[in-house]
Amino acid sequence: MRFFDKQIKAGDHLVTERLGYTHHGIYLGNNKVIHYSGLANGLRAGPVEITDLGTFSQGKRTYISHHSNRVFSHRQTVKRARSRLSEDKYNLLSNNCEHFVNWCIYDKARSPQVTKVAVGVASQVLLGNLSSGVVAFSIFNNIKNI
């Protein structure tokens, strides 16, 4: 595991790389992280759990995401995170590890990763439909002129 920040403190938002996405958790101190385990352990969605830092990062690059405009202090963030320990309501689109961390820090469950993917998919659908419409119009005009 590699860290690029000198000191991690309880309440810090940790981010670690995964294949195609990033995983998020809250550092509790004493080498422990609380996070929504989600699909980390296979196809079954897991609960909010406490794990050691090495297990959380799985040997991947891990860094602190700094929040200058956090609503809750580091101490309050830890308390909020612990209040959801064992919660088992993981949902990739509406209640994942990133939603969990942002709720702990801001009281707003949001996931910029999910938003980015949703916008990308919607754009592709719209562009695909637009392209299909142009092709259909072109074919219609060619048939009409025969």
Regions found by a protein language model. Give the residues of each.
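Cysteine-nucleophile amide-bond enzymes
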Residues: M1-I146
